[in-house]
Regions:
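Hydrophobic/aromatic packing residues within the alpha-helices of TPR/SEL1-like helical repeat arrays
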Residues: 233, 267, 307, 341, ...
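TPR alpha-solenoid repeat register
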Residues: 246, 279-280, 286, 320, ...
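Structural marker of alpha-solenoid helical repeat scaffolds
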Residues: 239, 272-279, 313, 347, ...
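Residue-level recognition of tetratricopeptide repeat
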Residues: 217-218, 252, 292, 326, ...
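Single-residue signature of alpha-solenoid repeat helices
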Residues: 229, 263, 303, 337, ...
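A contiguous, surface-exposed recognition patch within enzymatic or periplasmic domains that forms
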Residues: 1-77, 85
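Long, contiguous interaction/recruitment modules in multidomain scaffold/adaptor proteins
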Residues: 95-206, 386-388, 398, 456, ...
Length: 843
């Protein structure tokens, strides 16, 4: 939008909220609300305190749209100002600023028949003599002074010349010699809609290296859930091994994954191409990245040289001079370090890390007054500059003041361990290990990484006994919610392992590497941890996931996950994962249900487990029990995971109704089917607009027909024919279930329309035959899937089972029972837990 506002207005309360920000940095604006159907009303109930309408107003800074991102370069600062403010009485705001909101509309006055403009102005402050001016194509139409304020709303109707078009009008509000807000309607025209986003092509289909690079960058920037940038970079390097951009990009990718040695050659290759003709390249990013990588490798003299060469280029000077200053400070070359940091700050005076280092260097050089001024300026610029906060405390001589300052700083840091770790890392970066340890000791939480880092720094200071004690504390800490993820953590945890920490440190480092896709290292580390202490359930659980998903060893996965559950039989998450593994391994529904029945309280502790429990009841024919369990609980679905409990609700009632039909209890069947058509509130879900319920209406027609209610039965059969006759992959909750097409056909048969019926049955068979050998994969833009993604899914195999199921449905419709049975059998051989194939096989 080229306007600087977005808002929402409650016409019942005559009030609303506005967001105002410069559209050059906040171009994207979104208003979202659920619809008024059953599905939307259910989400209103879930997401609001008093079950009223749910509306999202969304804006972003430096982003055009909700899923769009922008880059934040090393040490870069992006600043913006935005205002959230209330307003009232204006109705539909046409333009707004932080000072005022205005509405302007033109319409025929029903009383006089004259064309009239209506102006409404709301101000956020008191303006006693504001001027409101309305102009048309021939000049001023209205000019009046009035008081406007949050309680004095200006409203006026102005009669317009007959030939006035709305776009000829302009309203402006002036006060104190300036314009508060203005608005001129734009000529109505059909806006040009942007093209929808396109999925990335496969690397081999992309023509140029530039496009391969940009696609890889896009996937990285958007942190795509299922696609990786690696194939795009590797394809580019296959075509041109010395490509500068791709070597830099792939080197950075490897470095961010902790593969420092593997990353180095890519930066050196980029430098080789950069200096092919000119020893002093136009852009020296590769030198900077090489310097950073060498720092992680501990080769600091080489890193210093690389940073110095990078500093020959304007774009890399801020970062390079900062790191050179830090490396010089580590060698106690404080004068040199100060020169470097001053040059870094020339490029970005707001670099808080550099400012903190400068204050520390000034203090080291005995320039106390200059250091004090620097600290004061730093804290004025950023009160959350914890390095400067600690420097201020160190410089204070009055013990009472010192304690008060320390208390205030700890209040700002909230005793949140990451704040202390971040600050300690900053100090350690320039060799201030003593300061780093003092910072870590301020946090009173018993958090493992605080002690591991303290030990690492204590060892650097030569305090071996202190380091040993810190390592002992780290190993004995509770591991809950400790998930190291920083590249600096690698060296710290490696040091801990090398110094005898074999129980927990390998576990933490294994987690870090698994997140960074280094699963072989993860498995080795977790196995080391398991050998040191095999009573830690999470280690066995992690190994199970890696064995199944990364090594293809389902037996080892089963062994480890069963061991994990045996160590903590009250861990519902581990039980959920174990059950999903049993499902993958082809355990029968009865076997799985028996394990749930051993301790129902586990399933009751989680919605996802409880829904699986109910599913197993239905699959084992315990429909009444499943229904009782459904009605005895309030469910809380997640967006994208809808449809699970409603499916089980429908299955339980439909299958009970089928039993009633078989035993000629037609009235009872009718009641059950009518109940199935309405979702009770406790399910937490409403019915999606467009849901056809063909299976329910077909069986309801049978129940009514058996009672002699032929007209009502015919209406039900007609309703059961409605819906698309195109089968789909059935991956998402809003996909039409395939058997709805079967019931369309069966309903057409009941209505005597054999041709329409057969066309449905053959469509199911044709789709199955045509797509049987398709390669299955997750759709590029998918952000949420309804199924648990604990263990890797073979979507090609899943697609084949689905196609066999579709062909079975088509043959059921055509009365080819033997063929149908064969296809159902094949579907269940491929996917033993196929729910719908199981239900139809029973019939």
């Amino acid at each position: 939008s080229k306007y600087d506002f977005v808002g929402g207005y409650d016409y019942g309360k005559h009030a609303g909220i506005l967001h105002v920000a410069d559209h050059h940095v906040s171009p994207g604006k979104k208003q979202w609300t659920w619809g008024c159907g059953d599905f939307g009303k259910a989400w209103d109930r879930n997401l609001t305190d008093e079950d009223g309408p749910y509306v999202e107003l969304m804006t972003g800074m430096f982003t055009d749209n909700q899923p769009d991102f922008t880059w934040l370069k090393p040490f870069e600062e992006k600043t913006f100002t935005q205002y959230f403010m209330p307003y009232k009485e204006v109705g539909q705001v046409k333009n707004a600023s932080k000072e005022a909101a205005v509405s302007l509309s033109a319409a025929e006055d029903t009383a006089t028949g004259k064309k009239t403009a209506k102006i409404i102005v709301y101000a956020t402050a008191v303006y006693e003599k504001a001027r409101i001016i309305l102009t048309g194509k021939d000049g001023v139409l209205f000019d009046e002074s009035a008081m406007i304020s949050p309680v004095d709303i200006f409203e006026k109707s102005v009669v317009l010349p007959d030939d006035t078009q709305e776009e000829d009008l302009k309203v402006e509000v002036l006060a104190d010699g300036r314009s508060l807000i203005a608005y001129q309607p734009e000529k109505e025209e059909i806006p040009k809609l942007p093209d929808p986003a396109k999925a990335a092509d496969e690397p081999s289909k992309i023509m140029t290296n530039e496009e391969l690079y940009l696609t890889g960058q896009h996937i990285e920037q958007y942190r795509h859930a299922t696609w990786r940038p690696d194939p795009y970079y590797l394809e580019g390097l296959k075509r041109d091994p010395d490509d500068i951009r791709i070597n830099n990009a792939y080197g950075m990718l490897l470095m961010r994954r902790g593969l420092f040695e593997e990353a180095e050659p890519y930066f050196r290759t980029a430098i080789k191409r950069l200096t092919w003709k000119n020893p002093n390249p136009y852009n020296s990013e590769a030198y900077y990245l090489l310097g950073l990588d060498l720092c992680y490798l501990g080769r600091e003299d080489e890193a210093y040289d690389a940073f110095y060469k990078a500093a020959w280029s304007n774009e890399q000077q801020e970062m390079s001079f900062y790191y050179m200053a830090a490396l010089a400070a580590k060698k106690s070359q404080f004068e040199t370090a100060l020169e470097h940091i001053d040059r870094s700050l020339v490029k970005n005076a707001h670099n808080i890390k550099a400012r903190g280092l400068r204050a520390w260097l000034l203090a080291k050089l005995g320039k106390e007054k200059a250091a004090a001024r620097m600290i004061e300026d730093n804290l004025e610029l950023d009160p959350f500059d914890f390095v400067s906060g600690f420097e201020a405390i160190k410089a204070e001589n009055d013990s009472e003041k010192k304690q008060k300052m320390l208390d205030d700083l700890n209040g700002l840091m909230r005793n949140f361990q990451e704040n202390y770790l971040m600050t300690a890392r900053d100090f350690a970066q320039w060799g201030a290990y003593e300061d780093a340890v003092l910072v870590l000791k301020q946090c009173t939480k018993k958090y493992p990484m605080l002690y591991y880092y303290a030990a690492y720094y204590e060892e650097k200071m030569g305090e071996d006994e202190a380091a040993k004690k810190s390592l002992e504390k780290a190993e004995n800490c509770d591991s809950d919610y400790c998930f190291p993820n920083k590249l600096d953590d690698i060296a710290v945890l490696t040091f801990a392992i090398e110094n005898g920490c074999k129980k927990k440190a390998p576990y933490y480092l294994g987690n870090l590497f698994y997140d960074k896709l280094q699963w072989k290292k993860s498995v080795e580390l977790w196995e080391m941890s398991e050998n040191a202490d095999d009573t830690f359930s999470i280690i066995h659980r992690n190994l199970a996931l890696a064995y199944y998903n990364k090594m293809g060893d389902s037996k080892a996965a089963k062994r480890e996950l069963e061991k994990a559950f045996s160590l903590n039989r009250k861990d519902a998450r581990i039980f959920l994962e174990l059950d999903q593994l049993y499902k993958k391994l082809g355990y029968s529904f009865k076997e799985r249900l028996a394990k749930y029945d051993e301790d129902p309280s586990l399933a009751e502790s989680r919605d996802d487990l409880y829904i699986e429990y109910i599913t197993l009841m239905n699959m084992c024919g315990e429909y009444e029990r499943a229904y009782r369990c459904i009605m005895g609980r309030r469910f809380h679905p997640w967006e994208g995971g809808e449809g699970k409990i409603t499916t089980q609700y429908t299955i339980s009632l439909l299958e009970m109704a089928k039993q009633c039909l078989a035993s000629e209890k037609y009235e009872q069947a009718e009641k059950l089917l009518k109940k199935a058509l309405v979702y009770p509130e406790n399910l937490g879900e409403g019915k999606l607009e467009g849901t056809k319920d063909n299976h329910l209406y077909y069986h309801l027609g049978l129940a009514l027909e058996a009672q002699g209610k032929h007209d009502e039965a015919k209406t039900c059969f007609e309703t059961a024919t409605i819906g698309t006759d195109e089968p789909a992959g059935a991956m998402y909750y809003n996909d039409q279930p395939a058997d709805m097409i079967l019931y369309q056909g069966l309903a057409f048969e009941k209505l005597g329309k054999t041709r329409e019926a057969k066309s449905r049955f053959y469509r199911l068979i044709d789709y199955g035959e045509q797509h049987l050998n398709d390669e299955g994969k997750i759709e590029y833009f998918a952000v949420s899937l309804p199924d648990f993604l604990i263990f890797d899914e073979d979507y090609t195999k899943k697609n084949r089972a689905h196609c066999c199921y579709l062909m079975a449905l088509g043959n059921i419709g055509l009365q080819n029972r033997e063929k149908a049975a064969e296809f159902l059998k094949e579907a269940l051989e491929i996917e033993p837990s196929h729910m719908m194939a199981t239900l139809y096989q029973k019939q």
